[in-house]
């Protein structure tokens, strides 16, 4: 959420940010927000004036009653009207503040000055790579669906029977390989990169979604259990960031870094016409998430560190990849800057997004009221929050299956995963 003071002082900058994000149509929201903010200011002033009047006259009434000099009936009647007006103003102010908050919640984050200009994903900018590793693929490569089916390790048909399209089933050594990936990533981030492991709930309340920015803008993408007021998490970013919602963090303990495995659930509304085969687009997938809470001045250094931690997984697995910087028209509404890590799919002959690494600056912290005190004499300030997929297993599995297959249809296990699988080949 943007700071209302920033919007008051920089309305043109906010509108320019909306233009860069290809959201020019939301510019009237800024004007409406400022109008409502001015109304609120006038309403608060009127309420304060009336309360001051009531306090002053109440003393006069008390003095009249104490001395017995004259009647206080007229003043009492006037103060009754004043109290009624104050009550009406309080109700109107509450409704107005709710409208202002809803408007604030719908505005996207500021963009960092280094975010490239662009209208869509086609204008994203290569940041690093391509990073290549040698794999002997001098034969027709099977895609992950063909290989997974022939080896008996993936079963999308039975997943569809159970739940519908987009819900994969891992079987036998495929299930073991998936678990190995998850454990390898968690161990790497906790042992080598300094993250504290968290195993969070997979369902959250609406306040948690609101805090990280998935609500209300992405409400159509989450699975909802209305009877219980709960939502299936689209990413572990939601519960892990909300661990500290409403808290003032100890400055001496910053940065705080968490790594968490979770299943992720996404409705993928609006995906009609996109490639939905196999792991390319699913409703349920596994992901290891990295979440960081930092001082504001340290957040962009932290962004590069988190990116490096995600890359380290791919380097260890020898999965070819590249890193792109998302342009202003493709970056998510919540992020001030974002990198995508894309893994190479030889069967699809294209790169597939496997990780996003984002700096939200104080956007989520303001929504979630997560603060810290720089020192004992300072007022609390908002932290900066960051997160990165480290990584999602679905598209990572696509690249792994395609790069580690053999000409005779077997699958070699990456060296880094052998201690976790207990086997070296799937056939």
UniProtKB/Swiss-Prot annotation:
Pfam families: Seryl_tRNA_N (PF02403), tRNA-synt_2b (PF00587). It is an enzyme of class 6 (ligase). The keyword Isomerase does not apply. InterPro entries: aa-tRNA-synt_IIb (IPR002314), aa-tRNA-synth_II (IPR006195), aa-tRNA-synth_II/BPL/LPL (IPR045864), Ser-tRNA-ligase_type_1 (IPR002317), Ser-tRNA-synth_1_N (IPR015866), SerRS_1_N_sf (IPR042103), SerRS_core (IPR033729), tRNA-bd_arm (IPR010978). GO terms for molecular function: ATP binding; serine-tRNA ligase activity. Its EC number is 6.1.1.11. Its main location: cytoplasm. ATP binds at residues 266-268, 282, 353-356. L-serine binds at residues 235-237, 289, 389. Keywords: Aminoacyl-tRNA synthetase, ATP-binding, Cytoplasm, Ligase, Nucleotide-binding, Protein biosynthesis. Pathway: Aminoacyl-tRNA biosynthesis; selenocysteinyl-tRNA(Sec) biosynthesis; L-seryl-tRNA(Sec) from L-serine and tRNA(Sec): step 1/1. The keyword Protein biosynthesis applies. GO terms for biological process: selenocysteine biosynthetic process; seryl-tRNA aminoacylation. Belongs to the class-II aminoacyl-tRNA synthetase family. Type-1 seryl-tRNA synthetase subfamily. Homodimer. The tRNA molecule binds across the dimer. HAMAP family: Ser_tRNA_synth_type1. Consists of two distinct domains, a catalytic core and a N-terminal extension that is involved in tRNA binding. This is Serine--tRNA ligase.
